[in-house]
Structures are given as C-alpha cells and as structure tokens.
Amino acid sequence: MNKYFAICPRGLEELLTEELRSLGAQYLKTTHGGVHFSGDWTLCYRANLESRLATRILWFIAQAGYRSEDDIYKLAAKQNWPDHFDVSRTMRVVTTAIKCPLKSLDFVTLRVKDAVCDTFRAKVGERPNIETRNPNVR
C-alpha cells in the first residue's frame, strides 16, 4: 500500500477527506492544505481523475528526519531512481517547505537533483536531462 498526499485549496480539506474516503482511501489524515492517505495505484489514478477538490496527488517515496542538506542528499541518493523512471525522461525537482530550518530551499533543490543524477550515473551510466518548463517527471 502506498502513501499519498492530496493537495487542495485551504478550507476544503474536510471535504477532500470525505471525497477520498468515498473513493476508497484509507488512513486519512487531514492537514492544512491537503490530506494524507493510503491506497493502491488504482486509487491514486482514480483520485487524480475523479477528485473535484484535489489539485495534485503526490506519492511519498521516502520520509526521514534531517539536520542538513547533506542528510536530504543521502536520503534521496538511497532511492533506486531507475525503478521510478527511465533515464531518457526529463526531470525537474521542486522543493517546498513550511518553517524549514535550512538556509536555502534552492540549495536543497540542487542537492536532491544531484542525488537523483548521481544515482542514475552510478546505476545506468548516464543521467537524466533537466527541463524546468515542461519535464516528464517532477
């Protein structure tokens, strides 16, 4: 079972929770700006296609505590990115945070991008291209 986060406009979280529940989502947790939930890939697709309230569905790949940008790099580098998308696909890393203790989210974004590219280079021998306007993977 996968973990997801459905983003919605503020004030609609409770309605989104009920909508996701009606689609079959489990372990729902309402928070500011969205709803955490669990389910299979079919549910993820249904939520993306049928939700009238969610603006985006995010898939949790990993989660851990951190103290520095290096901790985030190490967590991102542990993921087997070639299992998630092909090196021929273009990518973009987007970082958002609330009350982040780190100095620069732009630097965090670069470190995550570096970790993904370094993992591809180590496992596949090449890295994906970066496309900031219209990437295949974000």
Predicted regions and their residues:
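Accessory substrate-recognition/RNA-binding modules or partner subunits associated with SAM-dependent
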Residues: N2-V137
